[in-house]
Structures are given as C-alpha cells and as structure tokens.
Amino acid sequence: MAIVNQPRTLAEKVWSDHVVVAGTGEGAAREPDLIYIDLHLVHEVTSPQAFDGLRLAGRPVRRPDLTIATEDHNVPTVDIDKPIADPVSRTQVETLRRNCAEFGIRLHPMGDVEQGIVHIIGPQLGLTQPGMTVVCGDSHTSTHGAFGALAMGIGTSEVEHVLATQTLPLRPFKTMAVNVDGQLPPGVSAKDIILAVIAKIGTGGGQGHVIEYRGSAIESLSMEGRMTVCNMSIEAGARAGMIAPDETTFEFLRGRPHAPKGAEWDAAVAVWRQLRTDEGAQFDTEIYIDASTLSPFVTWGTNPGQGVPLSDPVPDPELMFDEAERQAAEKALAYMDLRAGTPMRQIPVDTVFVGSCTNGRIEDLRVVADILRGRRVADNVRMLVVPGSMRVRAQAESEGLGEIFTAAGAEWRQAGCSMCLGMNPDQLAPGERCASTSNRNFEGRQGKGGRTHLVSPAVAAATAVRGTLSSPADLAAEPTH
C-alpha cells in the first residue's frame, strides 16, 4: 500500500483510513496492520464456533450495533412456515437465533420482511456505504465493494476476532486495475463482463490483490450490475473487488433505511466523492478489456475461469499449451460429460436456476421476466426463480413479475441462497445439468454429481425457453404466445 503523501488508489485510501495500529517491519517479516471493521455480516453457517469462542472466553460482542445477521444458506425456499426438515440445517438456524438473542445482535430470520441473502440485504438496507470496511464469513463479501467499500470474506476464527474486538489483523494487499472501456453490445451484461475477466486472468490471476474495476463500461453499469461484477472477484483469486462511488451509487443509497439523512447525507456524499483513485497512482497489475468485443459468456468446465463466448464450441484440451491447464480441462470435460468441439448452443440442460448473491436482485428478475413474458419454459426443463431477499420478492410481486414466472412454468420461490450451493433442499440430482446465474461451478457445488454452467440472467431465461444453452438473440425469430 502507498504512503499517505503519494497518489493513492481507492483501496489504499480506504485501508489507511481504518488502520488502528500500523504493523512494523519490512517485506515478509512485516507485522499485520490492525484494521477497524465498520460492518460485520453474519449468517448461520460460519458463526456457531465463533460465538462458542466468545462464550468460553467470557467476552461480549464489542459492537453489536455494527453487526447484523440473517438466515440464508440453509433455509428452504418453499414451505417456510414449517420446521426445517434437515436436522443439520435446522440446528444451524436455531443456533444462530440463540446466539443473536444472547449477544444482542440484530437478526432477520426466515420469513422476516428484511430476510435474505446476506450480501443482498446489506446494500438494500443502506448498511453498506462507500469507504467502509465490511467483513463476513462468506467468500462473496466482495459484493459490497461495488459501493467503494473494502469488503472481504473471512474465516470462522476471524469472525470471532471481529465479534470480540471489531478489528482484524491484516497485511496490506497488492492492487490491480481491471479497465473495461467501450460500449457493451446488446444482450451483454455485467455477468458476461466478469466471466470474461476471469477467463482472461484465470482463477488465480487476482491472488493477493484488491481489484478495482474501472472504465466507461463499468461506470455505465447499474448498482446491481456493479455488485455482480464485484461479487465474483474471489473467483479470480482476488481478496476483494471495488468500484469507485459516483452519482449512481449515491442515488441507490439515497433514502435507504440506514443511509444518512438530511445534513448528514450531504456531509457523507461530500466525503464519498473523494473516494477515487488519485491521478498518477500506481497499481501493481493492470489489464484492459474492450467492452465492445464482449458477447454472452458461459462456463463449460468446473471452475469459473473455464468459460467461453456462447458462440464458441467446447474447447479442445489438445490445443492447450500448458500441461496443467490441459489436464484440468480433460478432467473438467469428463465430469461435465462434454466433448471438445461441441457447439455450446447445442448443450441441453435439465434445470435453470435464477438467483444467488450474484444475480438475485430486482434488475436480474426484470431481465428474466422480459424474456419469459408470453413464452413457456421447455417441457424438459425445470426452472427455479429465487429472489435474493424478501424485499426483492415483494418488489417483484408488486411489478407482476411473479405472475410472469409462474405463467411461463417456472417455480417462483421464497428468498435464500437456494441452488447456488448444496446446503439446502434445492439441489441437482447426480448427472443433472444446470444453467445457473450463481457464481461457482465446482464439482458437486449444486448437489453431488450435478453439472453447472454459469450464465447471465438473460442467457438463463433464453436457455429455459429453448432447452439448450441460448442467448436472447436465439429467441428473436421464435414467436411468443
């Protein structure tokens, strides 16, 4: 990280504003900085042992007012008025409820009007704000970086440390700029941008870095789109992803329940406007992407970096020069039951999942509804549409989107992480293939033996209608009903 009197990147500014005690030493021997944490998000999976640690040490939660909890990973998305059937999931949810009650932490339980995926409720409540440090025991905490916050996932022992001290010892990260300039072609979205970025730099390309996404294409994105991009930073190996706040950010936050009001709002915005990378600041790494060259993207393998444009065929491992890459591709194709050279558009799916902290927001649901309106989900396809929060669900209902989903033959569910991960009832059966708007396509991620293709909401909707991986352009010649 840069010293204060030099031009600084956005990440360096936020970092330096939160140093409680600076580490001493140089290079690898340098001690960590002690960083103050502004917002701590908690869910049922990674928190039980952390609370047990507090209990054993006789410690309280230092700042319960800066801590918020929700139930998202393990909760069902149907019959939410009934007890959770799976005993492990039920125990984790019940344990979170007891811990929050004991330690005085706000909790939005299943069915609550503000319940939802942790990375969706933070922004929608206005808790996530520019210049903050945000942590959660979840990989995709980088979502909140869309607001110009330094947000990162942490482990259970670190969760306990933050609960006890509201601080975290961290070593400074390297910085990377991902510049995306130009105009996106029609039908190309934020999800396609980030899938293309990961395919370009690889799943380890951002290791040890905070990525700042910059350029005209990024600035043109809505906050929902920016959250999608930052959400998947971890899939490129990065510690966090950030986008400088601007008028789009401020308008999204204005009037949110926990956003500043009145004179405090004006003062906050004045500070937030300074949260930009200085002219002349140096990044450790920098890459450039021409947005006008992008097209709908889809993964073919078992990590998010194994992706290609939808118009391409399945890659041939024999054409890969790197031996490790070739072996990984061969293993992935075997698991995915795909043959090299098969056009991506000819790959049939059994299931389509729309949701997750990547693409479970109202903008995503509107895109899907626009495509499904007047059309039917293919007879051989099961489609789940799962809102990222109860507030998103209520908004979708008020706009008539739920009726469009059900009329098309999709299942319109309650809020939760759902099929993003195999920790709740929404799972793939062995051998089932899914086009998913989520963020990970690892082996077994959506259920043991399940096969996942990561796609944008638009591609997911078109795929549901046609039954094979498709883009909205493929539907143009097909009539609606």
UniProtKB/Swiss-Prot annotation:
Needed cofactors: [4Fe-4S] cluster
Annotated protein name in UniProt: 3-isopropylmalate dehydratase large subunit
InterPro entries documented for this protein: 3-IsopropMal_deHydase_lsu (IPR004430), Acnase/IPM_dHydase_lsu_aba_1/3 (IPR015931), Acoase/IPM_deHydtase_lsu_aba (IPR001030), Aconitase_4Fe-4S_BS (IPR018136), Aconitase_4Fe-4S_dom (IPR036008), IPM_dehydratase_rel_enz (IPR050067), IPMI_cat (IPR033941)
Subunit organization: Heterodimer of LeuC and LeuD.
Residues that hold [4Fe-4S] cluster according to the record: C357, C417, C420
Note accompanying the cofactor annotation: Binds 1 [4Fe-4S] cluster per subunit.
Phylogenetic lineage: Bacteria, Bacillati, Actinomycetota, Actinomycetes, Mycobacteriales
Reactions catalysed according to its record: (2R,3S)-3-isopropylmalate = (2S)-2-isopropylmalate
GO molecular function terms attached to this record: 3-isopropylmalate dehydratase activity; 4 iron, 4 sulfur cluster binding; metal ion binding
Protein role: Catalyzes the isomerization between 2-isopropylmalate and 3-isopropylmalate, via the formation of 2-isopropylmaleate.
Pfam family name, one: Aconitase
Organism whose genome encodes this protein: Mycolicibacterium vanbaalenii (strain DSM 7251 / JCM 13017 / BCRC 16820 / KCTC 9966 / NRRL B-24157 / PYR-1) (Mycobacterium vanbaalenii)
